[in-house]
Curated annotation (Swiss-Prot):
Superkingdom of origin organism: Bacteria
Protein name: Pseudoazurin
Cellular component GO terms, alphabetical: periplasmic space
Subunit structure: Homodimer.
Organism: Paracoccus pantotrophus
Taxonomy of the source species: Bacteria, Pseudomonadati, Pseudomonadota, Alphaproteobacteria, Rhodobacterales
Annotated Cu cation binding sites: H62, C100, H103, M108
Amino acid sequence: MFHHSLAAAAAALLALAAPGFAATHEVHMLNKGESGAMVFEPAFVRAEPGDVINFVPTDKSHNVEAIKEILPEGVESFKSKINESYTLTVTEPGLYGVKCTPHFGMGMVGLVQVGDAPENLDAAKTAKMPKKARERMDAELAQVN
């Protein structure tokens, strides 16, 4: 009986001490995808603090840039070069809005939700952007929980 209790206690301690593993999410920048022309796919990513988002220019002439009005407080803006992959490690809970600089007017936007109940949801809903971008962003915001 003592050995079973000791083994159970050791297993519980190891489970508590094991570090969490960050997930890696891949987002493709495409000329054409499931939701139309000039898209991030997937356009909505659910992540946890510490996760990594890899933005991959699957098709040429794309980049990823933060939408400054849709970033958690304290997170610095970012912008990749055209035709280059970009890795973003999300550290703060909240919404991270992204756009492709040359195709923003065509609606090329995406959204990353980190954690639950983002504090910057209202800012994301009211951020000014071109009509097509606003329509797509609203569709992504509908997935926030």
